Structure formats: structure tokens, C-alpha cells
């Protein structure tokens, strides 16, 4: 998406008197003020217990989960245990795990010894009779049972029937949390290095979960146990069940197995629609590197909701049609060229599952990057012109009423701007870099540097500042920590004199170069938050700003 004939605009810096803007007020119309941001409700105790990485979470490091459960679909009942292996980072006698209050804690054991615990809302504080020592590894068995509640957009865990009346059970709990259906360390910062899932269900059903399928065992009581092995770090909300009357077909992308699971009546449609997965994976591998969960494979699984990015087990409910739920998602004719759910949810394998946010407040690292990856897919698949149309269409979806990054330590999903403003910020940053070869290298290196890690925005800022050898912190902060967009103020002289210009931004140090002039000869203007003058006159009528390459407001006076 590069522009041509880019030069640096000659200018002279001049700190203008504060009266300058009002003296020019008659030359244009000021931007309409944005609507006031809605007041945020005070965090509930449950939000803090879920979101805070407090003492009894921070004192240990997850190593491994072994989740062994049994599901009775008729009774909507789940029972089993999670074996949790962890290493202590500090001496202590208590750790925190999580399980929704409506589910029973049957018992928690360390070896043969039953442990005491205290429940507060959905938190479970587990006490040990002796001090757990820093550096040592421990393993506990957490037995539980109950009827999970359905909650949230996709149910958290939902018990449904398919069109043929057979049981169809699916989990999708990014917002609600893994503890809605299984005991876990239900937060974003700490992930086990891997896990094993064993799911016992009636013989006529199939379970598709995360990781590599390692076998099934007939238990002799009308139930079959399905075993899956996850060989990479995984966030607890990504752990998933997909239980139903599934049929399977497959493909390969090089050495990577592509496994597809759908209901029998969907097979013919899926064989056609799911063909989009292979070129999508090839495009993302070309940009960022190998598919991050190669040993576990890639799965695409039909579900009764729109879709979710479950690691190595991406779920799909987009009606086997291009666009999003048979709509032109961006309204500019590009979305109908591809299946939005396949492209978006699979992109989360790279950003969200491999590179993960360490706190829900930084969720834009997952959703903003993934939305930007949609545009990169369009660029590689359909060309730069379509990519520009596609990403600029996201501007209409941004509210700019609250910051993208929210308060840390509170489990509160940020504004939906994290998707669209996050993507448009990255699109803008590419134009700031103004060197596509460098941009492709930096984003690939960023991904490779933080693959299989949980990070915060500060980690990204430090990386980009070091790689690009400039301080981009004020630009990051204006777009992500402030609600308002930066506004480029242009004050033209009525008598044909020099142009006065500056950024109006909340970040005092905000200084972002931007392309101006016109398509025949774009030039780089370097505004700061102080007024400056160009050396040469600038005609108002023919003066353009490359707003398709930057997400900014422009006010001409």
C-alpha cells in the first residue's frame, strides 16, 4: 500500500502566538465535538478477583494441566478433575484457582492429603498445611461437578441440539472465563506449557478439542473417552469442547495437517468453503513464519455460533458463506470475496494464541492485530487497492469515546474500538514507518520475538522503538490510551501566504509525520503540537492529506 514520489516538505518551525487559531476562525468549520464518553461503572468484586494478578496467583507458575471430565448431555452435568502442576515462585501456604460458584468443589488433594479451601464468588483460595517452597514443583488434584450455567454471547458452555435432534455441546468462554466449566487459573498472564484433555461422552458422539488427537477408549458403560494432547502454551479460555455428531475430512498445507469437523448435513458445503483455509495459512506463514502450533495441527470445527479462535481448534458458524453472516462486513464490496470467520478467527492463531495479551486491558494486541491481519490477507490475496478500501471501511465502526487500553487488574472487556481502531493504528504506523520492506521485517520480527509469550503494550512499544530507532511512545499513547484521534489543524492564509499547521492531541509530545500535497506528488509534513509555518505558499483548494493511509482528523481553516 505504498505511495509514490514521496519527498520531505521544506518548512520552518515557528512557535505562533496563542491567538493564531481564533484569528483564522472565519476560514473554515471546526470539527464537531465527539459525544461524551459513557461513565464506567465501578468494578465489582468479581471483576477484581478475576482480573487482578494478586499475591496468590503471582506466587506460582503454571506448568501443566491434565483435565479429565465426564459429561452427561441429558442432564447437562459435568464432573471430573483437573490435575494442576505448578512451580512456586515464592514461599507461601496459599494459591488461587477459580471455579464458578454454581459448580461444586468436591475435594482438592495433594497426594493423599485433602486440602482446605475458601471460596469467594468464583475464586477458590487453596490452603496447604505446610509452606510450599520457592523453586519446588507441586501437583494437586481438583475434583468438581455440577451443572454449568450458560452465560454471555455464546453461552460460555452451551448444550444444544443439532438439526437432527442429536446433542451438540460447545464452549466459548473468552469473556466469561474458563472457570465457567472447569477449575483453572482463570487469568491471562500465566499459561501452562501444555496440557492433556480427556473427555468422556456417550458413544454416539464425537469430541473435538485442542491439540493432537491421541486416541479414544470405549469405557464399556455407554461412554467413550476422547484424548487430546496440547503441546504448546495455551490460555485457559482457549481450552474447548466441541461435542456432536461430527464427520471428518482433511487436507494438508505442506507438513501441516488440516482437519475439518462438521455435521453430516454440512459436509458438501464445508468441503467447498473450507478450501479457503489452506491459502490463508500460506499467506500468514509467508508474512509471519510457520503456523505456530504445527505439532497440534490446525482444525476448523462447525459450531452453532459465529466462531471463536480456540487454539488449534478454530470454531466456525458462518453459514458456509463469504462475508460475515452473509453480510458485506465492511460495506465496500471486499468482504464478499472471502469468509470472514475463517480468516479472522484463524489469524488469532498468530496474534492472540501465539502472541497473547497478558491482561484483558491489552486485548487490542489480540483483536487489533487480528483485524489488521484481515487487511494483510486482502492485500496479499486481492491486491493493495482492495486492502486500502477494506481497512478504511473500518473507520465507520470506531466510536472514539473511550481509550482502547483500559485499567489493568480488572476483568472488563475493552471497547470494541480495540478491533477497528487497533487495526487502523497499525495501518497508520505502517505509513509512519514509510518503508514497506522495513515494515514487513519489523512485524515479522515482533511476532517471532514474542511468540508463545504473554505481553503488554509496553513490550510492543519498547520493541518498535528499538527496531525503528525512534521514540514512538507518544503515538502509541495517543491512539491507545486516549479516546480522541489526533487532529491535523491546517490554517491557510487568505492572501496565499504560508500554511500554518500543528497536531491537536492530548499527548503533548505527539509528533507524527504525515503525507500531504496530492496524488501527483505526496510530501512529508512533520507537525508537532506547536504551530509551524511552511516556507512556500500552500493553496487550500488543491491541498490534500493522505487520510487513506492514516487514521486522523483533519481541520482546514
PLM features per residue range, with description:
Residues 23-79, 162-168, 473-474:
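N-terminal, polar/Ser/Thr-rich
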Residues 33, 100-161, 221-222, 532-538:
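A surface-exposed beta-strand-loop module
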Residues 80, 171-174, 185-343:
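Hydrophobic helix-coil surface modules that form long, contiguous segments used
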Residues 81-102, 183-187, 192-202, 458, ...:
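Surface-exposed beta-strand/loop patches in extracellular or lumenal glycoproteins
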Residues 90, 292, 415-499:
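Amphipathic alpha-helical substructures
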Residues 104-110, 208, 472-473, 488, ...:
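Beta-strand-rich binding/interaction modules
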Residues 134, 143-196, 244-252, 550-557:
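Glycine/proline-rich low-complexity spacer/linker segments in large multi-domain proteins
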Residues 231, 363, 367-428, 432, ...:
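Acidic/His/Gly-enriched intrinsically disordered linker/tail segments
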Amino acid at each position: 500500500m505504498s505511495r509514490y514520489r514521496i519527498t520531505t516538505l521544506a518548512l520552518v518551525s515557528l512557535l505562533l502566538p496563542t491567538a493564531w487559531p481564533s484569528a483564522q476562525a472565519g476560514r473554515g468549520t471546526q470539527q464537531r465535538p465527539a459525544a461524551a464518553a459513557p461513565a464506567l461503572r465501578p468494578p465489582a468484586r468479581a471483576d477484581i478477583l478475576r482480573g487482578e494478578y494478586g499475591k496468590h496467583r503471582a506466587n506460582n507458575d503454571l506448568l501443566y494441566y491434565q483435565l479429565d471430565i465426564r459429561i452427561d448431555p441429558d442432564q447437562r452435568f459435568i464432573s471430573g478433575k483437573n490435575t494442576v502442576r505448578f512451580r512456586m515462585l515464592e514461599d507461601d501456604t496459599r494459591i488461587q484457582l477459580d471455579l464458578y460458584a454454581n459448580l461444586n468443589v468436591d475435594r482438592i488433594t495433594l497426594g493423599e492429603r485433602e486440602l482446605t479451601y475458601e471460596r469467594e464468588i468464583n475464586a477458590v483460595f487453596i490452603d496447604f498445611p505446610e509452606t510450599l517452597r520457592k523453586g519446588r514443583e507441586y501437583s494437586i488434584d481438583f475434583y468438581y461437578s455440577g451443572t454449568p450455567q450458560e452465560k454471555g454471547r455464546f453461552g460460555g458452555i452451551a448444550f444444544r441440539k443439532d438439526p437432527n435432534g442429536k446433542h451438540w455441546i460447545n464452549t466459548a468462554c473468552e469473556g466469561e472465563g474458563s472457570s465457567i466449566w472447569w477449575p483453572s487459573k482463570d487469568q491471562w498472564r500465566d499459561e501452562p506449557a501444555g496440557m492433556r484433555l480427556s473427555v468422556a461422552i456417550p458413544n454416539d458422539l464425537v469430541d473435538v478439542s485442542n491439540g493432537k488427537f491421541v486416541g479414544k477408549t470405549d469405557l464399556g458403560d455407554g461412554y467413550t473417552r476422547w484424548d487430546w494432547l496440547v503441546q504448546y502454551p495455551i490460555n485457559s479460555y482457549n481450552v474447548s469442547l466441541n461435542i456432536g455428531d461430527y464427520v471428518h475430512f482433511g487436507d494438508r498445507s505442506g507438513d501441516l495437517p488440516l482437519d475439518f469437523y462438521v455435521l453430516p448435513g454440512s459436509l458438501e458445503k464445508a468441503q467447498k468453503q473450507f478450501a479457503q483455509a489452506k491459502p490463508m495459512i500460506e499467506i500468514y506463514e509467508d508474512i509471519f513464519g510457520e503456523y505456530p502450533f504445527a505439532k497440534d495441527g490446525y482444525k476448523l470445527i462447525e459450531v452453532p455460533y459465529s466462531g471463536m479462535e480456540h487454539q488449534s481448534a478454530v470454531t466456525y458458524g458462518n453459514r458456509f458463506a463469504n462475508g460475515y453472516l452473509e453480510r458485506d462486513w465492511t460495506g465496500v464490496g471486499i468482504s464478499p470475496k472471502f469468509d470472514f470467520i475463517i480468516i479472522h478467527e484463524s489469524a488469532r492463531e498468530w496474534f492472540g494464541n501465539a502472541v497473547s495479551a497478558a491482561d484483558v486491558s491489552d486485548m487490542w494486541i489480540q483483536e487489533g492485530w487480528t483485524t489488521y491481519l484481515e487487511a494483510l490477507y486482502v492485500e496479499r490475496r486481492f491486491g493493495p487497492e482492495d486492502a486500502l478500501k477494506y481497512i478504511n471501511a473500518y473507520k465507520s465502526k470506531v466510536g472514539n469515546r473511550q481509550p482502547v487500553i483500559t485499567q489493568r487488574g480488572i476483568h472488563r472487556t475493552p471497547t470494541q474500538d480495540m478491533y477497528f481502531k487497533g487495526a487502523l493504528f497499525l495501518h497508520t504506523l505502517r505509513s509512519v514507518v514509510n518503508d514497506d520492506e522495513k515494515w514487513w521485517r519489523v512485524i515479522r520480527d515482533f511476532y517471532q520475538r514474542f511468540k508463545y509469550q504473554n505481553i503488554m503494550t509496553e513490550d510492543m512499544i519498547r520493541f518498535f522503538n528499538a527496531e525503528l530507532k525512534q521514540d514512538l511512545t507518544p503515538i502509541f499513547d495517543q491512539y491507545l490510551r486516549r479516546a480522541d484521534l489526533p487532529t491535523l489543524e491546517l490554517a491557510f492564509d487568505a492572501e496565499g501566504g504560508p500554511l500554518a499547521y500543528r497536531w491537536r492531541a492530548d499527548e503533548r509530545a505527539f509528533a507524527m509525520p504525515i503525507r500531504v500535497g496530492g496524488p501527483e506528488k505526496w510530501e512529508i509534513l512533520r507537525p508537532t503540537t506547536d504551530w509551524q509555518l511552511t516556507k512556500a505558499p500552500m493553496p487550500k483548494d488543491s491541498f490534500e492529506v493522505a487520510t487513506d493511509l492514516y487514521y486522523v482528523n483533519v481541520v482546514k481553516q
